[in-house]
Swiss-Prot record:
Taxonomic superkingdom: Bacteria
Record keywords, A-Z: Amino-acid biosynthesis, Cobalt, Diaminopimelate biosynthesis, Hydrolase, Lysine biosynthesis, Metal-binding, Zinc
Role of this protein: Catalyzes the hydrolysis of N-succinyl-L,L-diaminopimelic acid (SDAP), forming succinate and LL-2,6-diaminopimelate (DAP), an intermediate involved in the bacterial biosynthesis of lysine and meso-diaminopimelic acid, an essential component of bacterial cell walls.
Recorded name of the encoding gene: dapE
Pfam families according to UniProt: M20_dimer, Peptidase_M20
Catalytic reaction(s) noted: N-succinyl-(2S,6S)-2,6-diaminopimelate + H2O = (2S,6S)-2,6-diaminopimelate + succinate
Entry annotated with the keyword Metal-binding: yes
UniProt-annotated catalytic positions: D68, E133 (proton acceptor)
Subunit comment: Homodimer.
Protein name according to UniProt: Succinyl-diaminopimelate desuccinylase
Entry's cofactor comment: Binds 2 Zn(2+) or Co(2+) ions per subunit.
GO biological process, one term: lysine biosynthetic process via diaminopimelate
Gene Ontology terms for molecular function: acetylornithine deacetylase activity; cobalt ion binding; succinyl-diaminopimelate desuccinylase activity; zinc ion binding
Length: 376
């Protein structure tokens, strides 16, 4: 059994449901300590984190990842027990194989190989690992990033092991992510008997035209790296459940996934301009859950795409699609270049999550060449 697979099996066999770690990080730090990494355990609240670094020079290349996994749901629906870490038909099965314990194992074996091949490599190698990525993400990477900023630890390049591939390993990497803005809109009408609409003011009717305008608005057209900003309605709720009452209020939950062509403040302002045209009373509260970030083509992107070309002989597509990730904290707090590169995302968060054993070995090889491209 090769080193990557052995490490992956050891990690996957631990039921580290978010925000629990249950010893995954000890496996990692034990491995790294033998490679002369300085380990700093950082526990915030109930969340386990660690920072590890080898070297004292720049550039500083950091691998960021998480040891927590999402719940398995109904375990009876799994064909193979989610924490048995079984291999079948060339696939390693289990919760977290793709998201993202396979990446952790691949980077550990790549680091081991790189340090042995280049013991006097330039720069420094760091690891930023948390058990709070799949949950609230309040005591994990964001706290570690703030700690690193406080101690003046520079991070030049950060590779995040999130599963980025869509059809084959290496076909897509993420060089940024869109921002996320949520709005909770309350449209205020007047409750009344449904047979006497002239004595009431139906907030659902008031909402329809305004929401249609919001849905049809062109917020921006995106740019070279980002698709156009997306506006979606996720929830609409109104009424008491009976058939003869016009409701007094209607609640609507909105979401923007926005590009660098807009700021969240600009989007908030434009929403209010549109709502104000409709002359009804409303209240709106906002929750900004993530800024957009972008790593343009440059040293880190080139190191990743060239490594993929070397190992897989394919041309990689850059993407900023998908949800938010911990990469945003590292990009925004530490001002680092950030790229997400990991295995296929086809089975993540699903029953029977799995990853190809060959892909794990190839991913380790890709990570090795990224290290080589940055630090030699």
């Amino acid at each position: 059994m090769n080193k990557t697979l052995k490490l992956a099996k050891n990690l996957v066999s631990i039921d580290s449901i978010t925000p629990q770690d249950k010893g995954c990080q000890s496996i990692m730090t034990n491995h790294l300590s033998h490679l002369n990494f300085k380990i700093t355990d950082l526990k915030f609240g109930e969340v386990d984190n660690f920072w590890a670094i080898r070297g004292h020079q720049s550039p500083v290349f950091v691998f960021a990842g998480h040891t927590d996994v999402v719940p398995v749901g109904d375990e009876l629906k799994w064909h193979i027990s989610p924490f048995s870490a079984q291999v079948q038909d060339g696939m390693l099965h289990g919760r977290g194989t793709a998201d993202m314990k396979g990446s952790l194992a691949a980077m550990l074996s790549a680091t081991d190989r790189f340090v042995k091949d280049y013991p006097n490599h330039k720069g420094s190698i760091g690891y930023l690992i948390t058990s709070d990525e799949e949950g609230p993400a309040t005591d994990g990477t964001v706290k570690v990033a703030k700690y690193l900023k406080e101690i003046n630890q520079i991070v030049d390049y950060c590779l995040v092991g999130e599963p980025s591939a869509t059809n084959e390993l290496g076909d897509v990497i993420k060089n940024g992510r869109r921002g996320s803005l949520n709005g909770i809109l309350k449209i205020i009408g007047k409750q009344g008997h449904i047979a006497y609409p002239h004595l009431a003011d139906n907030p659902i009717h008031l909402a329809i035209s305004a929401l249609n305008d919001l849905c049809n608005e062109v917020w921006d057209k995106g740019n070279e790296y980002f698709p156009a900003t997306s506006f979606q309605i996720s929830n609409i709720h109104s009424g008491t459940g009976v058939t003869n009452i016009i409701p007094g209020e209607s609640d609507v939950v909105l979401n923007f996934r926005y590009s660098t062509q807009n700021t969240h403040k600009q989007l908030q302002s434009r929403v209010c301009v549109i709502l104000n045209k409709h002359n009804f009373e409303y209240q709106i509260t906002w929750e900004h859950s993530g800024y957009p970030f972008l790593t343009p083509k440059g040293k880190l992107v080139n190191a990743c795409t060239n490594a993929i070309k070397t190992v897989k002989n394919i041309n990689t597509q850059l993407s900023t699609s998908g949800g938010t990730s911990d990469g945003r904290f590292i990009a925004l707090i530490l001002k680092a270049q950030v790229v997400e590169l990991g295995p296929l995302n086809a089975t993540i968060h699903q029953v029977d999550e799995c990853v190809s054993i060959q892909d794990l070995e190839d991913l380790s090889d890709i990570y090795y060449h990224v290290l080589k491209n940055i630090l030699t």
